[in-house]
Amino acid sequence: MPVERIGGDAERAIESVLRQEAPFPFELILVSAAPLAIELGTGVRNVIEPNRNPATRRNRAVSEAAGEILAFIDDDAIADVGWLATAVAYFDSHAEALAMGGPDPAPEDSTTAELIAETLLATPLIGSGVACHENRSGIFAIANASDVALVNLFVRKSAFRGFDEAIGYIGEDTSLIVSLLPHVIYHSAVRVFHRRRAFPGPYLRQRWRYRLKTGEMLAQGAAAYSKNLKIKAFLVVGAIAIIAAPITIVPYYVFTLILGVRATRLPVRYWPLLPFAFAAHHATYFAGIVWGWIRAKLG
């Protein structure tokens, strides 16, 4: 678990791991740039890595890990009490599985702004298009590397090839997962609760950075992106919607409202605002991908 500072969400994240109902021993490795102001109990270590590249930090933590299965979680996420036990039980009974992820819904104490962000990510067809953000049910092998996320990821240590430190922040987990397909499993009972960035400002800034990286990876021909039909379909539909905006506005409002209310946990009074939030979300995605692609091509 990469940790910048102790307090708030980080303390809850650490506590959620230490309170796991697991019938086996495990260790928690906290990786930080400087020693953390926390009393380390049994089974907890603080590994120091001054380099703030998240791929470098996680690789450093893995180099110190003694377990056969690596579990990755962020310091703003809370693990379900059976998180470790469920994942390990599946690995024990399925030797072919090399990696696993699961849903990462927002916690129950989320603010209205955070629940708007969750709705934008969780709505099928028009949201993120990512299984773990959509909180899908079931157990299945994923076909798209982005269907699991680093906030909730397990990898057999024997199969771990390292996060690509050249990619750095955003995309380093996708690169690793691609190398492990088709042996990556989505398991809906392997669950963490992940704090969302508040909408609009923090959320849209984060999504902009993510989609810039998507555009850059597309321009570089990375397979996980260039072969992703969802990205291509989104760009085509987005371009058509922009050109035909005068006649698509009303259908867009109705369509996003219907789908959004089916996925949201927001009170009813906020529902009419969802289409406007989706418009900002989609515009950020489209512009970010296009600008990231242009920027990469120019140099």
Give the role of each language-model region.
Residues 70:
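Short aromatic/hydrophobic "clamp" motif used to bind/position activated sugar donors
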Residues 166-222:
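Catalytic donor/gating beta->alpha subdomain of glycosyltransferases that bind UDP-sugars
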Residues 231-298:
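Membrane-embedded multi-pass helical conduit in multi-pass membrane proteins
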Residues 12-25:
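Short, acidic, metal-binding catalytic loop of nucleotide-sugar glycosyltransferases
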Residues 3, 81-119, 123:
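Conserved donor NDP-sugar-binding/catalytic core segment of glycosyltransferases
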Residues 127-154, 166-169, 175, 192-195, ...:
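A recurrent flexible, glycine/aromatic-enriched loop bordering the glycosyltransferase active site
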Residues 198-248, 266-268:
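Basic/Trp-rich segment in TM-proximal cytosolic loops or flexible interdomain/linker regions
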Residues 49-65, 86:
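Glycine-rich, basic loop-to-helix element that forms the pyrophosphate-binding segment
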